[in-house]
Amino acid sequence: MEERSVLMERYVIGRQLGQGTFGKVYYARNLSSGQSVAIKMIDKEKILKVGLMEQIKREISIMRLVRHPNVLQLFEVMATKSNIYFALEYAKGGELFHKMARAKLNEESARNYFQQLISAMDYCHSRGVYHRDLKPENLLLDENETLKVSDFGLSALAESRRQDGLLHTACGTPAYVAPEVLSRKGYSGSKADVWSCGVILFVLVANYLPFHDRNIIQMYRKIAKAEYRCPRHFSAELKELLYGILDPDPSTRMSISRIKRSAWYRKPIAISALNNETGKKSCTSEAPFSGPTICISSERNQEPPNLHNLNAFDIISLSTGFDLSGLFGERYGRRESLFTSRKPAAAVLVKLKELAKALNLKVTKTDNGVLKLATTKEGRKGRLELDAEVSEVAPFLLVELKKTNGDTLEYQRMMKEDIRPSLKDIIWTWQGDQQ
């Protein structure tokens, strides 16, 4: 592909960003919007020769199914007689792998990336999608240091399980792969991804692999027995978390929900860690960590009124430009609504309680400040229940209303006819509205 060529009369193609066995990746610009994208060009003939067409189709279906602030977004797919083209979100910051090679990360910075990774995996697993090839090379960064999980070519959908409910194909890079996957037995996709996340966390802080040996058989044995040693500078809380994640027995390995409840994970991140990380760490990398892919945690302790303090990557999905639901025909199938408000937190909470009273909704408040609202009468699918969560994003508040039980159509109707009109006095912007 020649530099400055135009693809499908929609994208101006620029420099080459990378190259793989089956194609190349280019920087490009959308002619109509001016948006920067990455164009992944795949040679049809090459993938047909090796029988990978189904894998490409799977990657397309998965990337359309998974839309999350910490998953690299697929905007559209195009094709000619010779090539398939993916128009993808452009991750200007490059691979997390390269950032780790330039400088060590302290635990606070590593926690920032790990929370985003766990948030992305939690979302994917809730959609029945398992990555199966998580490693630093498949974790990209945008210009704001937001993590982007990429390369779903080896991913498995829940539908690909056998009758025993387990996956049976060994995938991934050996150094990051769970022992049950290497044994070629049936395995849980979610448990296998959790193991890979644990290896990535170790590498983020140690700057080398927990399981490494020049002899591949010896490395497999170390993985099977979870034989590793943490550096002295690891905190006790981090060691405890890794011990739970890098458990060779998948039945007792930590789940994502347990990871989110762990002491190390729940520690708040200083905003300066996000704004000043790039280029501010002077430690030099000395150890290898390449073996032979958020929304952030909502479980941080805050001062009263116990609001969550979010950073840039939490609110990226509020941007109209990132609201991709229209591409996939699900604009009216949402189970959550987001809006911002410039009113004080106390005023927003009072308004939500007034709304609940007017609609005859039962109100309960959880320990982490979430308001739980529920109808008193049964609907088509039981009682309609929703969570109202208020988060602080200076200089405004972010309010998320999420259906947790009941019929989606009833929720949409209540949102359109009752809730949104009643809250108009406190709404500044509503997700999906044109600015």
Curated annotation (Swiss-Prot):
Role description: CIPK serine-threonine protein kinases interact with CBL proteins. Binding of a CBL protein to the regulatory NAF domain of CIPK protein lead to the activation of the kinase in a calcium-dependent manner.
Keywords, comma-separated and alphabetical: ATP-binding, Kinase, Manganese, Nucleotide-binding, Serine/threonine-protein kinase, Transferase
Start and end residues of each Protein kinase domain: 11-265
Domain of life assignment: Eukaryota
UniProt cross-references to Pfam families, sorted A to Z: NAF, Pkinase
GO BP term, pick one: signal transduction
PPI, as annotated region: 334-363
Official protein name in the record: CBL-interacting protein kinase 28
Molecular functions (GO terms): ATP binding; protein serine kinase activity; protein serine/threonine kinase activity
Induction details: By salt stress.
UniProt family annotation: Belongs to the protein kinase superfamily. CAMK Ser/Thr protein kinase family. SNF1 subfamily.
SMART domains reported for this sequence: S_TKc
Listed InterPro entries: Kinase-like_dom_sf, NAF/FISL_domain, NAF_dom, Prot_kinase_dom, Protein_kinase_ATP_BS, Ser/Thr_kinase_AS
Activation loop: annotated span: 151-180
NAF domain mapped to chain residues: 283-329
Record gene name: CIPK28
